[in-house]
UniProtKB/Swiss-Prot annotation:
Polar residues: bias regions: 71-91
Keyword Transmembrane helix: no
Keywords: RNA-binding, Stress response
PANTHER family: RNA-BINDING PROTEIN HFQ
Gene name, Swiss-Prot/TrEMBL: hfq
Signal peptide annotation: none
UniProt-recorded Gene Ontology molecular function terms: RNA binding
Name of the featured protein: RNA-binding protein Hfq
Membership in a protein family: Belongs to the Hfq family.
Provenance organism: Shewanella amazonensis (strain ATCC BAA-1098 / SB2B)
InterPro entries named in the record: Hfq, LSM_dom_sf, Sm
SUPFAM superfamilies the record matches: Sm-like ribonucleoproteins
Role summary: RNA chaperone that binds small regulatory RNA (sRNAs) and mRNAs to facilitate mRNA translational regulation in response to envelope stress, environmental stress and changes in metabolite concentrations. Also binds with high specificity to tRNAs.
Domain named Sm: residues: 9-68
Chain positions covered by the region annotation Disordered: 66-91
């Protein structure tokens, strides 16, 4: 199962390290906002005005509010660019 964590852990760790504000969408449609304070195999601790422990199995999507660098385990780094879709909601 460790191979399945090879993308998730560096992504969440970079969000935590750089204090990137995120929107977390749950499978029931609820949107949570804050910064990733900590995480483990099963939960993400999200901090805003209060800290919330969010179970990963309840998460649909994690959306960073700005671009950030994700460090690679091979010594390099890659840039995650949060795309803003100006047409979202317009129909």
């Amino acid at each position: 199962m460790a191979k399945g964590q090879s993308l998730q852990d560096p992504f969440l760790n970079a969000l935590r390290r750089e204090r990137v504000p995120v929107s977390i969408y749950l499978v029931n449609g609820i949107k949570l906002q804050g910064q990733v304070e900590s995480f483990d195999q099963f939960v993400i601790l999200l901090k805003n005005t209060v800290s919330q422990m969010v179970y990963k199995h309840a998460i649909s999507t994690v959306v960073p509010s700005r671009p950030f660098n994700v460090g690679s385990h091979q010594g390099g780094s890659s840039n995650y660019n949060a795309q803003q879709d100006d047409s979202a909601g317009e129909q």
